[in-house]
UniProtKB/Swiss-Prot annotation:
GO terms for molecular function: rRNA binding; structural constituent of ribosome. It comes from Cereibacter sphaeroides (strain ATCC 17023 / DSM 158 / JCM 6121 / CCUG 31486 / LMG 2827 / NBRC 12203 / NCIMB 8253 / ATH 2.4.1.) (Rhodobacter sphaeroides). Part of the 30S ribosomal subunit. Contacts proteins S3 and S10. Keywords: Ribonucleoprotein, Ribosomal protein, RNA-binding, rRNA-binding. Binds 16S rRNA, required for the assembly of 30S particles and may also be responsible for determining the conformation of the 16S rRNA at the A site. The gene is rpsN. It comes from the Bacteria. The lineage of its organism: Bacteria, Pseudomonadati, Pseudomonadota, Alphaproteobacteria, Rhodobacterales. One of its GO terms (cellular component) is small ribosomal subunit. Coiled coil: none annotated. This is Small ribosomal subunit protein uS14. GO terms for biological process: translation.
């Protein structure tokens, strides 16, 4: 199980990404628009650099909802491979059955 501080840190990052998403998107739009003057695009790039680091979506790391494990993460289920196997073997995931042929 991951430390609670790491899980809380990821939650905090996710909130910050949502908070700054619109501002970050508008600044990125300005910096990539070739029709605008270079000076205006450069100022937008500087403003983008002034935003908090944790407001970037690339800083978020997917973690298991039950254990907080960061590796072997299944996006559709939001679980790690270990919890997926455990819950599936107990029949707690609807529609998932052990394969046999």
């Amino acid at each position: 199980m991951a430390k609670k501080s790491m899980i809380e840190r990821e939650i905090k990052r996710a909130k910050m990404v949502q908070q700054y998403a619109a501002k970050r998107a508008s600044l990125k739009e300005i910096t990539t628009n070739a029709d605008l003057p270079m000076e205006q695009r450069f100022k937008a790039q500087l403003k983008l650099a002034e935003l908090p680091r944790n407001s970037s979506a690339t800083r978020i790391h997917n973690r298991c909802q039950l254990t907080g494990r960061p590796h072997a993460y299944y996006r559709k289920l939001k679980l790690s491979r270990i919890m997926l196997r455990e819950l599936a073997s107990f029949g707690q995931i609807p529609g998932m059955v052990k394969s046999s042929w």
